Curated annotation (Swiss-Prot):
Lineage of the organism: Bacteria, Pseudomonadati, Pseudomonadota, Gammaproteobacteria, Pseudomonadales
GO BP: translation
Gene Ontology MF terms in the entry: rRNA binding; structural constituent of ribosome
Keywords: Ribonucleoprotein, Ribosomal protein, RNA-binding, rRNA-binding
GO CC terms in record: ribonucleoprotein complex; ribosome
InterPro entries linked to this entry: Ribosomal_bL9, Ribosomal_bL9/RNase_H1_N, Ribosomal_bL9_bac/chp, Ribosomal_bL9_C, Ribosomal_bL9_C_sf, Ribosomal_bL9_N, Ribosomal_bL9_N_sf
Domain of life, source organism: Bacteria
PANTHER family in the record: 50S RIBOSOMAL PROTEIN L9
Protein species of origin: Pseudomonas fluorescens (strain SBW25)
Protein family according to the UniProt entry: Belongs to the bacterial ribosomal protein bL9 family.
Claim: Ribosomal protein is one of the keywords in the record: yes
Keyword NAD: no
Function: Binds to the 23S rRNA.
This protein's name: Large ribosomal subunit protein bL9
Protein backbone atom coordinates (compact mmCIF):
# COMPACT_ATOMS: atom_id res chain seq x y z
CA UNK A 1 0.00 0.00 0.00
CA UNK A 2 1.48 3.36 -1.03
CA UNK A 3 0.87 6.35 1.22
CA UNK A 4 1.95 9.97 1.52
CA UNK A 5 3.03 10.88 5.06
CA UNK A 6 1.34 13.98 6.48
CA UNK A 7 3.75 14.17 9.44
CA UNK A 8 7.00 12.59 10.58
CA UNK A 9 6.51 8.96 11.60
CA UNK A 10 9.29 7.26 13.56
CA UNK A 11 11.12 4.52 11.66
CA UNK A 12 9.12 5.26 8.50
CA UNK A 13 9.74 8.72 7.05
CA UNK A 14 9.22 12.46 7.10
CA UNK A 15 6.45 14.80 6.00
CA UNK A 16 5.73 14.38 2.30
CA UNK A 17 7.53 11.06 1.85
CA UNK A 18 5.84 8.50 -0.38
CA UNK A 19 6.19 5.16 1.43
CA UNK A 20 5.20 1.54 0.95
CA UNK A 21 3.65 -0.05 4.04
CA UNK A 22 1.72 -3.20 4.77
CA UNK A 23 -2.02 -2.79 4.26
CA UNK A 24 -2.91 -3.43 7.91
CA UNK A 25 -0.48 -0.79 9.23
CA UNK A 26 -1.82 1.74 6.76
CA UNK A 27 -5.53 0.97 7.25
CA UNK A 28 -5.48 0.49 11.02
CA UNK A 29 -2.96 3.10 12.17
CA UNK A 30 -1.66 5.64 9.65
CA UNK A 31 -4.92 6.51 7.88
CA UNK A 32 -7.30 6.65 10.91
CA UNK A 33 -4.89 8.79 12.96
CA UNK A 34 -4.37 11.25 10.10
CA UNK A 35 -0.67 10.50 9.77
CA UNK A 36 -0.92 9.60 6.07
CA UNK A 37 -3.16 9.68 3.02
CA UNK A 38 -3.43 7.36 0.02
CA UNK A 39 -0.88 8.09 -2.72
CA UNK A 40 -3.27 8.90 -5.58
CA UNK A 41 -2.70 11.59 -8.20
CA UNK A 42 -5.46 13.76 -6.70
CA UNK A 43 -4.05 13.39 -3.17
CA UNK A 44 -0.52 14.20 -4.40
CA UNK A 45 -1.78 17.45 -5.95
CA UNK A 46 -3.80 18.34 -2.83
CA UNK A 47 -0.80 17.56 -0.62
CA UNK A 48 1.50 19.84 -2.64
CA UNK A 49 -1.02 22.68 -2.21
CA UNK A 50 -1.15 22.11 1.57
CA UNK A 51 2.58 21.34 2.06
CA UNK A 52 3.49 24.75 3.55
CA UNK A 53 0.53 24.61 5.95
CA UNK A 54 1.44 21.07 7.07
CA UNK A 55 5.12 21.97 7.50
CA UNK A 56 4.15 24.95 9.69
CA UNK A 57 1.86 22.73 11.80
CA UNK A 58 4.67 20.17 12.19
CA UNK A 59 7.11 22.91 13.23
CA UNK A 60 4.59 24.23 15.78
CA UNK A 61 4.10 20.75 17.26
CA UNK A 62 7.85 20.27 17.56
CA UNK A 63 8.30 23.70 19.17
CA UNK A 64 5.61 23.00 21.77
CA UNK A 65 7.18 19.59 22.46
CA UNK A 66 10.59 21.24 22.98
CA UNK A 67 9.01 23.74 25.39
CA UNK A 68 7.44 20.89 27.37
CA UNK A 69 10.78 19.02 27.31
CA UNK A 70 12.54 22.04 28.82
CA UNK A 71 9.92 22.17 31.60
CA UNK A 72 10.22 18.42 32.24
CA UNK A 73 14.03 18.52 32.37
CA UNK A 74 13.82 20.71 35.49
CA UNK A 75 11.27 18.48 37.24
CA UNK A 76 11.78 15.87 39.92
CA UNK A 77 8.58 14.04 40.82
CA UNK A 78 8.03 12.22 44.11
CA UNK A 79 5.51 9.38 44.22
CA UNK A 80 4.46 7.83 47.53
CA UNK A 81 3.53 4.16 47.57
CA UNK A 82 3.09 1.48 50.21
CA UNK A 83 6.15 -0.72 50.53
CA UNK A 84 7.51 -3.54 52.65
CA UNK A 85 10.52 -3.41 54.97
CA UNK A 86 13.02 -4.20 52.21
CA UNK A 87 11.79 -1.45 49.87
CA UNK A 88 9.68 -3.68 47.63
CA UNK A 89 6.40 -2.03 46.66
CA UNK A 90 3.00 -3.57 47.23
CA UNK A 91 1.93 -3.21 43.61
CA UNK A 92 3.87 -1.10 41.14
CA UNK A 93 4.29 2.37 39.65
CA UNK A 94 3.33 2.39 35.96
CA UNK A 95 3.13 4.88 33.13
CA UNK A 96 -0.33 6.05 34.24
CA UNK A 97 0.92 6.92 37.76
CA UNK A 98 3.95 8.79 36.42
CA UNK A 99 1.86 10.72 33.86
CA UNK A 100 -0.63 11.71 36.59
CA UNK A 101 2.21 12.91 38.85
CA UNK A 102 3.78 14.96 36.05
CA UNK A 103 0.41 16.49 35.12
CA UNK A 104 -0.20 17.36 38.78
CA UNK A 105 3.17 19.13 38.89
CA UNK A 106 2.13 21.42 36.05
CA UNK A 107 3.21 19.81 32.76
CA UNK A 108 0.53 18.00 30.74
CA UNK A 109 1.78 14.47 29.91
CA UNK A 110 -0.19 11.56 28.46
CA UNK A 111 0.50 8.04 29.69
CA UNK A 112 1.40 6.97 26.15
CA UNK A 113 4.29 9.46 26.20
CA UNK A 114 5.94 7.87 29.26
CA UNK A 115 8.45 5.13 28.41
CA UNK A 116 9.42 2.42 30.90
CA UNK A 117 11.70 0.06 28.93
CA UNK A 118 12.34 -2.20 31.95
CA UNK A 119 8.66 -2.48 32.87
CA UNK A 120 6.88 -0.97 35.84
CA UNK A 121 8.74 0.34 38.90
CA UNK A 122 8.53 -2.16 41.76
CA UNK A 123 11.06 -0.81 44.27
CA UNK A 124 11.64 2.31 46.35
CA UNK A 125 14.35 4.60 44.96
CA UNK A 126 15.25 7.13 42.28
CA UNK A 127 14.63 6.36 38.61
CA UNK A 128 15.26 8.23 35.35
CA UNK A 129 12.19 7.92 33.15
CA UNK A 130 12.09 8.85 29.45
CA UNK A 131 9.16 10.91 28.20
CA UNK A 132 8.71 10.72 24.41
CA UNK A 133 6.97 14.00 23.50
CA UNK A 134 7.50 14.04 19.73
CA UNK A 135 9.20 11.89 17.10
CA UNK A 136 12.33 14.04 17.54
CA UNK A 137 11.93 15.27 21.14
CA UNK A 138 12.49 13.18 24.26
CA UNK A 139 12.97 14.35 27.85
CA UNK A 140 14.26 12.56 30.94
CA UNK A 141 12.51 13.04 34.27
CA UNK A 142 13.77 12.00 37.70
CA UNK A 143 11.09 9.98 39.55
CA UNK A 144 11.60 9.38 43.26
CA UNK A 145 9.52 6.58 44.79
CA UNK A 146 9.24 6.73 48.59
CA UNK A 147 7.56 4.36 51.02
CA UNK A 148 4.36 5.55 52.66
Amino acid sequence: MQLILLEKVANLGNLGDKVNVKAGYGRNYLLPYGKATAATAANLAAFEERRAELEKAAADKKASAETRAAQLAELEVTITATAGDEGKLFGSIGTHDIADALTASGVEVQKSEVRLPNGTIRNVGEFDVAVHLHAEVEATVRVVVVAA
